[in-house]
Amino acid sequence: PKVWVCVSDNFNVERLTKDIIESLTEKKCDLSNLDTLQVVVKKNLTSKRFLLVLDDVWNEDSLKWERFCAPLRYGEPGSKILVTTRSKKIAEMVGNPIPLEGVDEASYWKLFKKCAFGSEDAGEFPQLEAIAKKIVGRLK
């Protein structure tokens, strides 16, 4: 199974575990006890290979991480947990960080023109080009 969970600054173990269950089962989860929730996750992941994406993680509390990850250890070898974060400390805490570099300004400009103007030719909109270039500069 593949699961994507938006974490943000609310690293609530119960909520995240519920989100995983709802993604795995495609059903609303009305359970609230963390132990019960984790049994359900374990049952759904045991002997299965999975990909779990935890997007925009901010929490640096290693005890919460350990509690959250407990039922995830039952997946098959090859299962992966991908964590996106802006925090170097979190990246190092959860495993093997891969720092991503930004896209160069020329590539941003090319993409922006295609999205904003419908093509890579901004020539039809010279009055907007200066504003668009300022926006692109901020995207980095």
Regions of interest found by a model, annotated:
Residues 20-22, 26-32, 77-80, 87-140:
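Non-catalytic, charged helical/coil tracts that couple and regulate nucleotide-powered enzyme cores
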Residues 14, 69-72, 120-124:
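Generic detector of short alpha-helix boundary/capping microenvironments
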Residues 1-40, 58-59, 101:
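Post-nucleotide-binding-loop coupling segment downstream of the phosphate-binding loop, primarily
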Residues 35-103:
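A conserved switch/coupling segment of P-loop NTPase cores
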Residues 8-9, 73, 137:
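Tandem alpha-helical RNA-recognition repeat domains
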